[in-house]
Every structure is written in structure tokens, then in C-alpha cells.
Design a protein with these regions (language model features):
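Alpha/beta-hydrolase superfamily serine-hydrolase fold, recognizing
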Residues: 1-216
Length: 216
């Protein structure tokens, strides 16, 4: 639904606050390009950066919603294939679980911008076959303790249907001794990072960027 153009103001603000270079990936969207097409594009982009002399340990991946899922898919893919992983991942209200049956997705299934019906539709259009649900790079909840993941910060919002699955993903990482930190903003909602004209949203974005900068 979004693109480099829609996210350019947000990414530019992040780069200014973090004082770092950010490379945006214009990845192909479903339903025209189903899983794992975007993951393959992301891996190509990562390998291109490495080929240009950027050390993988100096790379951090960041995304919001579906973009956060893609960032985590890359780190899962690297870990599952015993490749060196990136320095860190910063996941802003990530979509993690194709089952769409958490308590928060039921509680906030409508009336909060993102709906349960929309999420079911997104996953249906994203998956190529039902077997994708058993793939650890598609279904993030299938993370296993033999996967060594990078430092992780996960941003959640109180009125987001995806908040519980993101929190459960954070808990799984914590249980297996991965560095993970959850930043929860109880009064906010899915998509707030792109709505910084709202005072509460801007305050939250500035707060989580301060946290992000500390691990870079």
C-alpha cells in the first residue's frame, strides 16, 4: 500500500534524528508479487550493500508494519542459513502472525484504522501457498532457539490490533536470551510513526529514535 514516496518524510526525519545514512528499499508488493519475492529483493539489496564495502555488522534494518515484517524476515533468513547477521533490527508495530487470532486483534478489530478484516486480507494476498505459514521467514512466530538474531527493539501501540503478536514475538526472543527491548506507547495506534503532526505521535517517535540511536 505504501512506497518510498509515501515514507520519504518519515525516513528523512529518522535520518536527521539518527544522524545516519538510510537506504530505502522499493520492494515489490503483493498480490502481484507474493512471498518470498520481497524477501529475495531485500536479500539482493543487502548483498549489494555488502558488496559495496558496507560491513554487515554495521547495518541495522528498520521498518514499520509490513516493512517491519520484511526486516525481521531478513534476519530470520540469515540466522536460519547460518549467515552472519546484521547489527540490529528496529521493528515498528510489526505484523508477525498470519493466524490473526490474538487478543488485541479481536479487541481492536475495527475502529482503529487497521482492522482485523484488512489483516486477514493482507496475509491472504501475501502468501503464495498455505505452506508459507510453516516457513520461519513468513511466520515470525515460528522463531526457534537455534536462530541467533541481532539486537532487537520492537515498538508497539496500545490501540493497535498487532500489539499482542508483536509483544509475543518480543517475549520469544527474550526467552532465548536474545537482546530485545519493547517500547510500548499505550495511547497510540497503528501507523502513528507517519503522523507526527499529532503531538503525542511526534513525542513517541522522538522517544523511540533516542532509544534506537543508543544501540546503533
Amino acid at each position: 500500500m505504501n512506497s518510498i514516496e509515501t515514507h520519504d518524510p518519515t525516513v528523512s526525519y529518522f535520518a536527521e534524528k539518527l544522524r545516519t545514512k538510510i537506504y530505502s528499499l522499493e520492494y515489490s508488493l503483493s498480490p502481484e508479487h507474493k512471498f518470498p519475492f520481497a524477501l529475495e529483493e531485500a536479500m539482493t539489496a543487502l548483498d549489494w550493500l555488502i558488496g559495496k564495502g558496507v560491513a554487515i555488522e554495521n547495518i541495522s534494518l528498520c521498518g514499520d508494519s509490513a516493512g517491519a515484517h520484511l526486516a525481521a524476515s531478513v534476519t530470520h533468513h540469515l540466522a536460519d542459513n547460518q549467515r552472519p547477521n546484521v547489527h540490529s533490527q528496529f521493528l515498528i508495530y510489526p505484523m508477525c502472525d498470519p493466524k490473526c487470532n490474538s487478543q488485541s486483534i479481536e479487541l481492536f478489530q475495527s475502529g482503529y484504522l487497521l482492522t482485523k478484516e484488512a489483516m486477514i486480507w493482507f496475509w491472504e494476498k501475501f502468501r503464495k501457498t498455505s505452506q508459507d505459514d510453516t516457513n520461519k521467514t513468513f511466520n515470525l512466530m515460528l522463531y526457534t532457539d537455534d536462530m541467533e538474531l541481532p539486537k532487537t527493539i520492537i515498538v508497539t501501540a496500545g490501540f493497535d490490533p498487532l500489539s499482542d503478536e508483536a509483544e509475543e514475538y518480543a517475549f520469544k526472543l527474550h526467552e532465548n536470551d536474545n537482546y530485545v527491548k519493547q517500547l510500548h506507547y499505550p495511547s497510540l495506534f497503528h501507523g502513528f510513526a507517519s503522523m507526527t503532526r499529532l503531538k503525542a505521535a511526534k513525542k513517541a517517535v522522538d522517544d523511540f529514535l533516542t532509544e534506537y540511536k543508543q544501540i546503533l
